[in-house]
């Protein structure tokens, strides 16, 4: 774009959705607005707030990189900002390569915030060797368009340094700077008691392979107000629809599974919007578990938290921010949350926050980016706008046959059926003028010469939750 002194800068942000997007829970889950993990929205919303200034407007680009969109981005935006988490991992290699294809076609600056490499706790990068060329190409493309690249912590910095990259800065994660230079956190009570409100979080692998299931089970037996906070799309589907096509959904040790006692007792939640997530955690006394952004959400709510680290991605971030943490492999499955709470020291986190914040905004300035705390209102207008929105509530277990809950779900199903019917009508209209059976088959797809019915498509979208609820004996 041409640079005019009086024109506001247009910043394109890689994020699943804008913080100001509202809609139904069903639509959010169907579109997967948080890219399989709601923790992604914690840091993308923080980046959106931090980078919004009187001279900069921020726009969400979605998660998927589309190289064919490069020319439009060049014409419409002034800078592309890419907040990332553990992007240097084998399962993310293909999306990373697509992102590189897009970036190589951009003529505007590209700034990466907080990218991380994922490896075992011992910081052994051997498992990343097969994707080294993909990482090299990505980092080189970014550094051709920025002064430096921001990484999560020490391990990722060393990983890139070993490849020969020098313009690498450790900045942590933007989520920790949501509220600027100050970070207030104190233990609001003495030792935890049976009446304490405790939040717990954990991935499927931590629950299945690292003993977190036993820790949760014991905590559930002792603390009546324990609540599990889920983060994955499959967990949201299990909570809202009672089923998911993902194979991990069959793991009954997860509190998000319908057979789990915490599910049946309505002691599980998942949040689409970080502002709702953080807001509901404010009344809790402690948070713990293996999810780094699940615990960061609690810290931002002023709730003492301890992270149970299972790999380098969480460990390096905890070390950088001095977040209380334990290696999950060294935590006995008999540990009581009260022990973690008592041992947690937040002095380093609180006292070192301003220095880390200044380092972060220094990185932004070196890359030509303003921030709301130095150049704006500290996010006041952003927060006020969020406060005025009617955001969807937490996703919670679907138990019972509450008419309101049924109405919302059936209403969404009906709208989806109408959309699919309209889409089918369009396809049939396009096919009506065709006389060649071969042409019809090509248009429809491989292996079949008939259009999928609305009913079949709807079933693929929602599965069988309604029938299972109405006929539980099946």
Which residue ranges define each predicted feature?
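Active-site anion-handling motifs in enzyme catalytic cores
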Residues: 1-470
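Short linear elements at protein peripheries
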Residues: 473-474
